[in-house]
């Protein structure tokens, strides 16, 4: 997902936890981090990211054609050997803009 308006709409439609996750990712664009690293930053229990991301599946599929305003790298391709998550600079700018709306 790269359209600013679409990202802002996703931000608005997501849960408080999804917004918190997006804000944390937008604070460090282009920085790939494992789920536990992000969960530590947010002081979340383990596996919360999986729950939050899974919780917006229906929203993503029905309103956004499956697109998401964040990126994944699976464990087979990541340097850490674990799933990693991040946002690019365009996504981060759109998320920060949506925070102010």
Describe the predicted segments one by one.
Residues 12-20:
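Short helix-coil-helix linker/hinge
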Residues 45-67:
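Short amphipathic alpha-helical interaction segments
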Residues 26-31:
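Short helix-capping/hinge SLiMs at alpha-helix to coil transitions
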Residues 34-40:
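A short acidic, leucine-rich amphipathic alpha-helix
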Residues 1-12:
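Short, Lys/Arg-enriched N-terminal segment that forms or immediately precedes the first helix
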Residues 72-101:
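Phospho-regulated, low-complexity intrinsically disordered regions of nuclear gene-regulatory
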């Amino acid at each position: 997902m790269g359209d600013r308006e679409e990202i802002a709409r996703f931000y608005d439609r997501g849960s408080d936890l999804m917004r918190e996750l997006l804000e944390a990712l937008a604070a460090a664009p282009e920085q790939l981090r494992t789920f536990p690293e992000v969960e530590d930053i947010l002081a979340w229990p383990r596996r919360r990211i999986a729950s939050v991301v899974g919780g917006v599946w229906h929203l993503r599929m029905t309103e956004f054609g499956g697109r998401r305003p964040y990126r994944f790298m699976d464990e087979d391709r990541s340097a850490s050997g674990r799933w990693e998550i991040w946002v690019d600079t365009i996504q981060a700018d759109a998320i920060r803009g949506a925070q102010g709306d």
